Curated annotation (Swiss-Prot):
Subunit structure: The glycine cleavage system is composed of four proteins: P, T, L and H.
Protein name per Swiss-Prot or TrEMBL: Glycine dehydrogenase (decarboxylating)
EC number(s) on file: 1.4.4.2
UniProt catalytic activity: N(6)-[(R)-lipoyl]-L-lysyl-[glycine-cleavage complex H protein] + glycine + H(+) = N(6)-[(R)-S(8)-aminomethyldihydrolipoyl]-L-lysyl-[glycine-cleavage complex H protein] + CO2
InterPro entries linked: GcvP, GDC-P_C, GDC-P_N, GDC_P, PyrdxlP-dep_Trfase, PyrdxlP-dep_Trfase_major, PyrdxlP-dep_Trfase_small
Amino acid sequence: MTQTLSQLENRGAFIERHIGPDAAQQQEMLNAVGAESLNALTGQIVPKDIQLATPPQVGEAATEYAALAELKAIAGRNKRFTSYIGMGYTAVQLPPVILRNMLENPGWYTAYTPYQPEVSQGRLEALLNFQQVTLDLTGLDMASASLLDEATAAAEAMAMAKRVSKLKNANRFFVASDVHPQTLDVVRTRAETFGFDVIVDDAAKALDHQDVFGVLLQQVGSTGEIHDYSALISELKARKVIVSVAADFMALVLLTAPGKQGADIVFGSAQRFGVPMGYGGPHAAFFAAKDEFKRSMPGRIIGVSKDAAGNTALRMAMQTREQHIRREKANSNICTSQVLLANIASLYAVYHGPVGLKRIANRIHRLTDILAAGLQQKGLKLRHAHYFDTLCVEVADKAAVLARAEAAEINLRSDIHNAVGITLDETTTRENVAQLFNVLLGDSHGLNIETLDKDVALDSRSIQQSMLRDDAILTHPVFNRYHSETEMMRYMHSLERKDLALNQAMIPLGSCTMKLNAAAEMIPITWPEFAELHPFCPPEQAEGYHQMISQLSDWLVKLTGYDAVCMQPNSGAQGEYAGLLAIRHYHESRNEGHRDICLIPASAHGTNPASAHMAGMQVVVVACDKNGNIDLDDLRAKAEQHAANLSCIMVTYPSTHGVYEETIREVCEVVHQFGGQVYLDGANMNAQVGITSPGFIGADVSHLNLHKTFCIPHGGGGPGMGPIGVKAHLAPFVPGHSVVQIEGMLTRQGAVSAAPFGSASILPISWMYIRMMGAEGMKQASQVAILNANYIASRLKDAYPVLYTGRDGRVAHECILDIRPLKEETGISELDIAKRLIDYGFHAPTMSFPVAGTLMVEPTESEGKAELDRFIDAMLAIRAEIDQVKAGVWPLEDNPLVNAPHIQSELVAEWAHPYSREVAVFPAGVADKYWPTVKRLDDVYGDRNLFCSCVPISDYQ
């Protein structure tokens, strides 16, 4: 049969690349689950009253090459001026060995948060290195494995200061007036919901204010001044005030550690350790505190523990502080963080080592000294005598200076009265400094760089003697060993080999949507047109970004059924927080600010109650019925009981139990009836796209996990992106920004993230995904995700009961396997099964969430039938092994499950187990073998013997 030209062009080719099962395999699976077609299957599963008649109109699919060409043209509209704006963002030189072997390597960017440490030792080691860098530079005792950005880290520091403060009646937080404006913006937003009074004043006046529980200082002020705060900190500590200091990683290479000056908390951005500006992110924040406050710290902390054989092994420590366990009582709502970016910064430090970092920092400072000396010779005045990399230069004709800068394609900081700010960085050259002289002085200045360099080298006093670092940094061997590219490449590969990522096997984590992150989607994030823009550059220089973001927003509006989208939240947890703030401010605009009750189903993810608490709401739990659905009677009773104060409900759809609840519209109607708003958590949006939508269902606001449904990779624990979609009445209440006006959003609300568009440089990933899939491809992806989950459930249900199902015994895009009956019969737990799956070459499903004693499986649409069958075969083989334990063939205390995972060295070790070595390490044959490098972690030992810095190299060997 002759094909048409349209058929030969095959514009939907990417759909077949993204979706795992081909048409024939889909039909085999449909036959297995008893459905005629994808439409018939989804028609059976999804409630009729919420099914869309036609898919959202987001255009036809484009090929990978056409989409890349289209986006390249859009990116070309961005203007890459040389940026000296500073304010926490600088140009960087990302070492190519790290660019190629980490940022562009799916072995690093497709991994998940290291909840399963046995398959995560590589990135855990890199994160431990990041913590060591943080400890060395800050001079404190305990560091986290990254937070979302510097501004949110400041807000977390404020919240932590209140938690640990002994001044229980104090309710005021002092912020020095020269912190970055975006930091102050986010702090004010967070303080409002906590009921804190924020005082902004000159740091010297901090002691003049009473009832202050915490103080935020910035070691190098926003306009460049280095502060010696040691005396002030000492006086504040005498008053029992918790002191937080914002600092700069590169400056700390030369400057005294704030921890040594008495600071309780030190935080900042690790961006300038190799991570491009990317129009605002993603970037990792660092966060450190005194040991006495460790259990009040936010975010992930990597600790050193031991495995079952007594060998050194790494794990996430003190997880009982976190939202997935403590819910509304958690230290923070942070779920993921910025692992990929923290690891880039970590390896940047490893690659350069202490000598290289000092060379870079000294070069930056020397060029700044040269610039300062030349300007002062010509009569210009500097606002600050002490500086590291930033000058605040008073100019008589500011407009003329800025005009010359624009003509030279240079951006200076322009928001300072009668002055300009100039921040140099590791990319700055002597030629750049000469060009800056031309901009500030005109072409006939007559200054000579070499002459100025000699003068500066003999007499530089721009860093106070008291502020010069006098201790060694990064003395651990890991920072002094891998400085040739060969050594660095091999070190990074050795770490990568320890981990299990999507480039090796399916990661069937329920509620996580570990789908394909296609190469074509990833390519644009390293284009300089996207990577090199400062987030506060003039808007006319970012027209490409604005066009891309506008198109993506328009597509997301259509896919969600909402009226507007805000791109600022840089994680799903931040999206929840921003959405709840929009609801809060909406009620306040109607003189109903007393509405503060948030209804949350018992099955909800831990971020929901944690976010509600952060937004200043009180959580009331709604019961679930025996089928796992929201108990409508309990909902009505509690909505009516709290009618006067009902703010909202937070509900996930399909439910966290993996079912399309039939009564979701009724849930929305009940809440609206009593004056509340409906927050629909977008965690399971991958089962909605093209089939239904939150807006069509009746919700008012949702966050979207772009790192789930829309293909941004998880990065081993971040970056994420959590934009919110809202109905029109909530649009005026989404986050704004104090530095940059967000076009199209008429909002005066405070910011929730440091940058106006959050982690803007990863938005091209989602743009590419939607552009290449088109309307039909997006719908088909949701349908195949549902098919894959039902195929697994139907084949495993006789071996492992499926805990919750909807109509006709179907599940949505994930299923919960109930291990509790097996545990009661045999003593084998969900943990044993999870660890045994490692021997079969798989990452475990989600354990004990949302129900203790279960495994939640989400295969996504990207896994083909062969991989699904391999997983099913592994689960059935494990069930047969459990039966061996039940029959007494293997004792409960010594069998392949309780001893899992097994490592390579056991092949040649003494063997006294009642099962063979082959059963231990090759249960599925040798073809798909993954070798973990440690045995099962000893969690109790790790928390009782907390150690969160680098261990001797020999311990890794």
